[in-house]
Each structure stands twice: as C-alpha cells, then as structure tokens.
Amino acid sequence: MTLASIRRGYHVIKTLLQYGLDDVLPPKMTPWYFKLARNSLFWIRNKHKGKSGGERLKLAMQELGPVYIKLGQMLSTRRDLLSDEWANELAMLQDKVPPFDGALARQAIETELKAPIESFFDDFNETPLASASISQVHTATLKSNGKAVVLKVLRPNVEAKIQADLLLMSQTAKIIDYLLGEGNRLRPSEVIEDYRVTILGELNLKLEALNAIKLRNNFLDSDALYIPYVYEEFCYPRLMVMERIYGIPVSDIAALKAQGTNFKLLAERGVELFFTQVFRDNFFHADMHPGNIFISRDHPENPYYIGLDCGIMGTLSEVDKRYLAENFLAFFNRDYHRIAQLYIESGWVSEKTDLQAFEQAIKVVCEPMFNKPLDEISFGHVLLELFRTARHFDIVVQPQLVLLEKTLLYIEGLGRQLYPQLDLWQTAKPFLEQWMAEQVGPKAMFKKVSTKLPYWSDKLPEFPELIYDNLKLGRKLLSSQQQMLDKYLKYQQQAHKSNYLLITSAILLICGTLLFNQDATLWSPYVCLISGAALWIIGWRSRPKNRKF
C-alpha cells in the first residue's frame, strides 16, 4: 500500500466518522480496542446525531467524491442488502461535479484524434454541455457534413484515481468480511466486485460506442426508442462522438405536459421496451435513470424515447430468461411451490435447500402483495422481495439479475411517474406468455432443429468414422478395464495368501511361547516357534508390492 493510498484511507475513515457512521456498526465490530483506536487517531465527534443513518451515509459519500457517489447510487439498487430507508437516501445522490478546464478537454481529444480538432470539427465549444464524475460532453459540428455532434471525453487521470479508490474499497471490504465472519448478509467483497466491474466498463468509451451501435441496430425501425447515431471512426477508449439530440428530459413533466404528450402511450411503451430488450434481444440498457432518457419533441401524440449513455448493458442466458419469465407467471398465479422449484432448478439457490421451508418463506413475503389491485403490484419489488427471501437460503448472487432488477425498478418508477394508472401486469403479461409459447411450443422446437440442421448436415459424413472410432475406443476401454480387473484380482489373491500365512504364523508363535510354560514334550515348543517364524517370513515376503492397477 502506497503513502497516497494510506492518506486517502485516513481521509475516508475520518469522513465516515465525522458523520457518525461507526454508531450504526454492529457491536461485534466495535470492541473496546476499536473505540480506543478511534479516539486516539481521530479527534472527531459526530455532529449529525439528529440525522438518520441513511442520510448520514449519503452526505458522507457526497463529500468523498465521484467514485463514492457512484458506489452509493449502485448500493441504492441493492435493496436485497439495504433497508428501504437507506436505499431511498442513497438514490438521491447526484453525479454532478464541477467541469474540468475546456483547454484540457481539447488537449485530451486531440491526443486521441492525433490531430487538431479543427481537422475534423467546426464550432468546438470549450464550455461543456454537461459534466459528470467520469466524463464531460462538448458540442461541435462535423466539418464533412455540418451535422451537430457531441464529443464525450474522459476526465484527465480518472482511471488512476478510480483504481486507487477501488483498491482501498476492496481491502476494506475484506477486513469487514473477516470481522463479520461467514454467513453475513452484507457481503461487502461481493458488492465491491460488482461495482468494480460496472465502473471499469464505463471507463472505455469505445466499448460504450459499440454498445450504442448494437442497441441502435436492434431498434432501427422502432416507433418507441431512438438511439443517436455514433460516428465510429471518431471513437476511441477515451473519446466518443455521436449525433446531438434535442429531446425533453423525461423528468421534466411540465414541459412534456405543455407539448401535449400522450403519457399513457409513453408509459406503456417504456414497459414494452424493457421486455423487448430483455426477452427478444437479450441486450438491455442497464443504466436507464432519468438523466439518460429524453422524450421526442415531434409528434407528442405518438412520443418515443431517446436513450443515451450505453456504458452499462446487461445480458441474460437463455436459462435465466426462461426461469425469469416463469417466475413472474408463477407469482401472478400464486404458485409459490413452482417459484421455489425454479430458484433451485436454475442454480440461483443450492439444490440442498429445504424446498418446503423455501416455499413457505416465499408465500409469507408474496401473499400480502395480493391485498392490493394487480395494477398496483410492482414487478421490480416482486423480484426484489424474492431475492431478499432467497438471501436467507444462501442465494448465489447473479450480477446480471442485479442489473435487471435495478433497470426494472427504474422503468416501473418512470412509468408510474408518467402515468400513475399504468397496469404493468396487463402490459407485460401478453408479452411474457407469447415469449414462453415461442420457447416451449412446437414452433420453438422446429426452430431449434432448423438452427442446428446445417451443423448436423455438415457433420453427417463424419458419423461412420466417429462411430468406428467410438467402438474402437470402447474396445480399448473394455480391454483396459479387464486388465485392471485381472491385476486387482491377482493383488487380492496375493494379499489374502499373505494375510493367511501371517495369521497362521502368529498363532504358531503364540502357541510355542505358551508351550514353554506347559508340561509338553521338549520338541513341541521349538517346532511351533520355528514353523511360525518360517511362515511369518514367507507371508511377509509374499505381500503384494504394487497397488496400482
């Protein structure tokens, strides 16, 4: 650990203590020697005793800077780990930081382009359009066609700063893991690893550009979603250039009302977009918070979404998708036994889990949800409560499902903000049922066979040779097994013979010793002893030497 990381660690601990976050730790983590060290190294008092633990954590992360703000935002989606009170506070963290110098942005852009900005762009504005913890955005026009574009560039030295903070977080998480011991539900190392993967993915703008291109191609003819065009020839790990858009922020409800937006259609399209991305394309935008979503200004009666920032994308395996769809359908059919089975069959919880106990725990959590109308039930909270319940049965955390849960909560919250009467179930159920029918029906089977047919046709001429090779290999295995069996039987016979001789020799030696004390003929003890010794030597030397078969 470097001196700089030690200083940073001291600053982080000091900040957390200033907000009295040691007060919320369990007693086993604050023994007398912890309190002694705290008072010796940090002459700090908690000045925020009137605030809740969640609010204090939010303020501390806000003060610690961008990396911790993003960590807090991620933690706000892990409601399977945190209480709603803490999660709601962290959700209010805003990734807004002062912009860095426009001259530095110009320098960073020209380093990536290996040419002056004016070689490719006109009207470059050194005053940023937007600024965040990892990057900031500048406007310009393309010299080749005059189209308006935005240039997204990483902050100077941001990678080194993030790596240093991640190392510190990882080391701290390991210490907390050790203190809490096995079986703790917080699992800090797991949380930090999820965060590390997420934030490092955001540091590669070339990857973000490729994600945006793929998502755009998936929705080229869509009336519901528009992804701005990416100029791939100008995209690098630290620079991304894309079409400039002029939509209305989805959070600006007043502006959307003023232009006469069809809120019902917009909310329903948001739900359809989510399920289309997950179940049709298996490629979903996993960072759909309001800052990344805009609404079209044209045709407010037929509005569409504009999606930005494709740095965090999610995918699911075919198995995950099937089990997820079945989970939702089983929940709304109140089939808790099937839900428990699905969690075990999918490998999300151990196969050793007590099925009846798990089913009962799911029923206790889910049954009260049906006390309210179906249109008020939240898909995201259903998934969340199921994960929370599974936590008590040692669920194997699936990062892709955590991303899905976060995205679903965003989409639901957004949909009900736009149109409070949104019936999520009625919107999603036909989609889920159609997808399930396509996966398990005759058409699905025919499609899978058709997909595999070219491969089988290509391999068909090789089948006779493969059969011959397998038969030949089988004969070799049988011959090898027979040889091993013969060796084993021979070993057993030798061992049996040796043991018989050793036992007999032991009996003769014991008898010879006893006869010395009895009224026996003079030669009897000697015969027994000599015979016993001879048999012992023969038995010992006849022991099988090699146990390898």
UniProtKB/Swiss-Prot annotation:
Keywords: ATP-binding, Cell inner membrane, Cell membrane, Kinase, Membrane, Nucleotide-binding, Transferase, Transmembrane, Transmembrane helix, Ubiquinone biosynthesis
Active-site residues, Swiss-Prot/TrEMBL: 287
Biological role: Is probably a protein kinase regulator of UbiI activity which is involved in aerobic coenzyme Q (ubiquinone) biosynthesis.
Subcellular location(s) per record: Cell inner membrane
InterPro entries: ABC1_dom (IPR004147), Kinase-like_dom_sf (IPR011009), UbiB (IPR010232), UbiB_bact (IPR045308), UbiB_kinase (IPR050154)
Protein name listed in UniProt: Probable protein kinase UbiB
PANTHER family, per database record: CHAPERONE-ACTIVITY OF BC1 COMPLEX CABC1 -RELATED (PTHR10566), PROTEIN ACTIVITY OF BC1 COMPLEX KINASE 7, CHLOROPLASTIC (PTHR10566:SF113)
Higher taxonomy: Bacteria, Pseudomonadati, Pseudomonadota, Gammaproteobacteria, Alteromonadales
